[in-house]
């Protein structure tokens, strides 16, 4: 279920996905909600483009640390490529 950040208290949330398009974000929200995950989604900026880099806005999806592995597995099974930190 989509939550506000304060629902998670002082937990350091884990970024699991960056949706670049609204349709993609809405689909992912449905997948996470249907599976019963609590998550936060917030707009933020990322760099995109191959030849011409530009700053874009996407939907950043976060989950609690205890849900990270299960959420990543769910995303992969649903055809999404989870965000991997560098």
Model-derived regions: residue spans:
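Acidic/polar low-complexity segments and flexible, solvent-exposed patches
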Residues: 1-86
